[in-house]
Amino acid sequence: IPHLCHSGKKGYRSDGNCRACMVEIDGERTLAASCIRTPTPDMVVKTESHRAKSARKMVMELLVTDQPSNEKAHDKSSHLWDMANLEDVSESRFPELEIERIPLLDDSHVAMNVNLDACIQCNLCVRACREVQVNDVIGLAGRGHDAKIVFDMDDPMGESSCVACGECVQACPTGALMPASNVDASQIGDSMDFDREVKSVCPFCGVGCQISLKIKDDKVKWVDGIDGPANENRLCVKGRFGFDYIDHDHRLTKPLIRRDGAPKGLNVNPEDPSSHFREASWEEALTFAANGLRGRGREVAGFGSAKCTNEEAYLFQKFIRQGFGHNNVDHCTRLCHASSVAALMENVGSAAVTATFNEIENSDVAIVIGANPTENHPVAATYFKQFSKRGGKLIVMDPRGQALKRHSSHMLQFRPGADVSMLNAIMHV
C-alpha cells in the first residue's frame, strides 16, 4: 500500500492527510485511510479491490501533477517517486499548476534548500519540527489552494529561528526539503547518489547518536540519523551538517616542521602556512618530535580531551606514564565531574548514570540542573521537550535563563553559587 504522510518511525503519529493509502472495508460506504484506521475484530479490509486501487492511483496522479518531472526532480529517488512507480504513475492527465503560482526557491539557509514546488503538504516536516524535535519553527499557513509550509511568520528559512537539526529534511518524502550538499545549481538531486554507506556514531558529544554517512568519491556527501537507542533517528545541527571540516582546505594533510627562526604563536595564515612551516616526511617529523620530547621528564604534563575515544585516552595516559616516567596526566572530565562521581558512588553505588535520558518517558517529574541540553546535547533535549509537551512536570534549575525554560513548568533561576544551599533546602522540605 503506498503511503506518503505516514512515517512509521518513532515519534511520528499517523496523520492520514495524503490519502495515498486508501483501502476498502466491508460494510462501509467510504474508503478509509489505512494509516489512521484502527483494526477491530472481524473487520474485513480489501487492499486490492478495484475501487481501492483506482482511488490510490488517482491520488498519486493528482500528487504528481504539480511535481517537477522525475528527470528534473529535486530528489530523483524520493519516496514519492517510489510510490508513484509502485502505482505505475509517471505522468498526470490533469492540468499543471499555473507558472505564477509555483513557489520560488528558498536557498537562504547555508545547509538546506527549500523547494516548495515539490511539496505535497503531507505535514511530515511539521510533525518532525513540532512533535519530534519540538522546535516549533515549521507550520502550515493559508487556506485551501493557498495553504503552504512556512517558517515562523513566513520568513525565509535562513532568517527564521530554525536550529538546523535537519529532521524535516530527513522526513520529507518528495525532495521539497533537501541538504544543500545534495542538489546542484539547478536544484536537481538524488538521495541515492552515493557510492557507499558507512554507519558510525556521531563524534561530537556524549549522547551517542548513530549516524549513516553517505560517501561519494571518498567524501562525505550528507549524513542521516539512524534508529539507535540514544537518538531514534534524530540528529542535531552538528551531527547532521558538521562534517565539512573533514575535507576543508585548512586541514593538514602533510607533516609540517616550523622553520628555523619562525616566531611561535597563532598568527599563522591558514591559507599559506609555508611562511612559518615547511613540509616534511612522516619519518623526519616523528624523529623531530621525539628528539624534542626526549629527556624532558616532568617538564611535560598531559591533559586529555573528552573528545577522544576510550582507546585514545588509554594510549595517551600510557604515553605520559611510560614515555615520561611520571603520573602527571589528567583529563578535563575529572575536573567537572569529580564531585558528582563522589556523590553518585555514595548514594547509588555507581559513578555512571543509572538510566538513559529517554527513560524520562516513564516519569512524572524531571529536574534538570547543572546542564544546558538544548545547547550542549540537543538530541537529549528533544526527549525533555517531548516529556513537557505530553504534560510531564519539567523543573529547570539554572542561574542562566537557558532555552529549556520555555518548555518547563517551573524555572528556578538561582544566584550563581547558591545551588548547594538550594538543594539542601529542598532536601529538608
Where do the model's predicted regions map?
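N-terminal export/assembly segments and adjacent metallocofactor-ligating motifs
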Residues: 24-27, 43-428
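N-terminal cofactor/phosphate-binding cores enriched in small/glycine residues
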Residues: 1-41, 54-55
